[in-house]
Amino acid sequence: MRGKSRFSLGLVILAGALLFSLIGWGAGLYIEWLWFKTLNYQQVFLTRLTSEIGLRVLVGIIMFLLLLINLMLTRKSVLKAVESAKAFRPFQRDDDNVITINPNPQIDWREQITPGRLTLAFTLLSMALGFLYSSSVAGDWVTILQYFNQSSFNITDPIFNKNLGFYFFSLPFWHIVYRILASAIFLNIVLVALVYLVTDTARGGLAKIFRFPSARYHLSVLAALFFVIKSWGYRLDQYDLLYSSTGVVHGAGYTDIHATLLAYKALMILSLVTAIIIIANIFLNRFRLTAYAIGGLLVTSILLGSVYPAIIQKFVVLPNEFNREIPYIANNIKFSQQAYNLDKIEQKDFPAGRTLQAKDIQENKNTIDNIRLWDWQPLRQTYSQLQEMRLYYEFKNIDIDRYAIDEEYRQIMIAVREMNQDQLPQQAKTWINQRLKYTHGYGIAMSPVNEVSGEGLPHFFLKDIPPVASTNIKINRPEIYYGESDDGYVIVNTKTDEFDYPKGDGNSYSKYEGDSGVKVNSFFRKLLFAFTFADYKLLFTGDITNESQVLFYRNIKERIPKIAPFLSYDADPYPVINNQGEIYWMWDAYTISNMYPYSEPFDDRGNNYIRNSVKVTMNAYNGSVNFYISDAEDPIIKTYAKIFPGMFRPLSEMPEDLKKHIRYPEDMFLVQSRMYSLYHMTDPQVFYNREDKWTLPTEKVGEEEKAMDPYYTITVLPGEKNPEYLLIMPFNPQNKKNMIAWLGARSDGENYGKMVVYEFPKQELVYGPMQIEARIDQDTTISQQLSLWDQRGSSVIRGNLLVIPVEDSLLYVEPLYLQSEQSKMPELRRVIVASGDKIVMEPTLELALQKIYGEGAVLKDRPQQGVPPATDQPAGQQPAPEKTVKELAAEANRLYDDAQAKLKAGDWAGYGQSLNQLKDILTKLQNQSFSQ
């Protein structure tokens, strides 16, 4: 009885655990449904859910039926074995109730088997294995839907003459089908063989199975079916040769076509022959014949699949590799260019020999005014010190964009002030504060890329809380509920007022006016949220009302992939301000594949095709998300549009004030740049010898030499009239430091997406970035000044070196930042400019240009940046004398002690004011130190 009780208790515990898991899964699923519904993407949710569950159910049922049918076919043999086992009972009782001992005693578990129990066991085992096996196709729903909604590429491969859509959409589908069938049949063979062996149907070993007709018939049919499927697998392997990496280039080479392809064809036939032999052996009853057939196939697969191709490669290809591989190299060049859109890059010459004059600087004022002097890394630290305002605010990232500022095309740096609850003091990290009160960030900081104050700090177009604008850019909805930092859930429209922003000695509070959250308007929903978030406090708080909403998945890098996990995304979403003063996030999405024949992969996962097919926008206040198709020619996005009707909109439907801010994405441009460094060579001979291979340049950032990143700038392309927003990457020749070309991607208007490469004359020296860096290090005036700053306890931070095309020449610009040991606020103190053989370092870009080109290079209609602003003094009145370094240091210590006292007292407003005063004193102290 005790054993039965334990068994019953175990069943109860198991059932309880399963029920708990089922409730958790159901609660999470329902919450997901409500979330998708608030975003109007419920159809996307249903399509994904029904596809994934439907696929798993279908595969699970197929596996269940296959297993059950095959196990039931062994039932008769098992029951016979059970009957025969009864003759070997260790104890026997006769009719007179006399017990005798069996001379051959052994306890046999088969005596416990009854027909009913056996059927139940087979059914449960089949169900369990079918359920487990179904999980192997959990991520294949996208491939299945792509197969049934595929689009044409209008391009055929050069070997099998199939449309590329076959390789993108059909071949992966058939691989899944093959994998399911082959593994299912193999599992059935193993399981059935084990049943026959365990029940002693084949007493004496596997070979004895063939003495029993039922076992022989059963296993022979399964084995024959397996080799028929294997034959089909060899057919699929032939198409996979187009992704071979064994030759001189990626894709099918000479050996693949003349050896491996023939081997697969032969093995396909031999697999069918093996299946026929196995079926014939049902009647011949010769186990060795089956063993020889299978063994022969294995040996042949090794000889034909590995040894023969290796011999061809070594003795036929390698002695005359180029001539053998010419057509396949040409295929690789052609299809790699197509896969990365390199065949659409316009090629032009760039003389680069002309020396710029002062009038060239004046005539290209818009280009000069938009040269980026602020790098995002030091600027983020500076923004942090100047504009975070409170310890719980954070600038997660600094982004770059362009705006029409007072009717002038300007490149700007922009950052969103987000809420970081981790920075709250420990005593303030209560459930109310984290879930109900501190719910959102506030506002934006924006500054031009080139303007600097007299203290080496950025000049702000947008700043402070509430937002203060010095230009035509306004913020009317500064609250940030959705962004890059918002990872946790919050509840809005509760009885607790939401903290909006600090105001004087107190705070301003607000109520959420959006409808992007899921309402908690019933105890049932409250229970589901508490269960899903594992947060019991949701059940017992009295602050939640019927109008309360739960906002979750607020981080853009979680929210958007939750809707469209089948897309890939750029590393850097960026904020945009529309004409109504609302803040949006813009994010580039890619369609990526590893199924483009002959194309060279760009990553370790074998991906060899990329398109920036989608632009995604997300409202920072209400979290609404929209997907816009930016590359309507991409067959993959066409397929997704068929799968999810209504999800993707044409780019023409994007509001114009947002469309002005789309830009060519950096991640894709970097991939294309790396590929173009090799695939600009179209001649197979030149390509094979790597005679004209380019490399991406390096630069000196800080004290380290790093790979140069692509960068945005505003300039006028040669032959064009208007300035435009470009993404640029220079190139070096392989193993050289000089510059050979530069690639530009256009981002404005009708020219969006067009790419052009400008090549320099190969007979002329054009300085590359590291050559300019070397000249900076070798310049005695510059190096002495840098050493002097280092000796005074300041860190010198070398910014990104930018190569700026101006007319038919180049301008090299590198900013220098100083950061004291006490302050974490880098200041822009010098600008290095190189042009031709001249290199100078001055406090401002304007002064550097004047030193190179003369007074005529002054940009007259804009005051020089970096010069302390003049102050209006009444006549005859002298300015107050500056405090000494000692006095400033004492004042700094006093303010620090004052700030700490206010922090302990919980006076956040006073704490912030003291920190701002301390910052001003430290700035004055640093300036006096540098001037001495």
Swiss-Prot record:
One of its GO terms (cellular component) is plasma membrane. InterPro entries: UPF0182. The chain crosses the membrane at residues 11-31, 53-73, 118-138, 180-200, 209-229, 264-284, 292-312. It is a multi-pass membrane protein. The keyword Ribonucleoprotein does not apply. It is found in: Cell membrane. Keywords: Cell membrane, Membrane, Transmembrane, Transmembrane helix. The keyword Membrane applies. PANTHER family: UPF0182 PROTEIN SLL1060. HAMAP family: UPF0182. This is UPF0182 protein Dred_1797. The lineage of its organism: Bacteria, Bacillati, Bacillota, Clostridia, Eubacteriales.
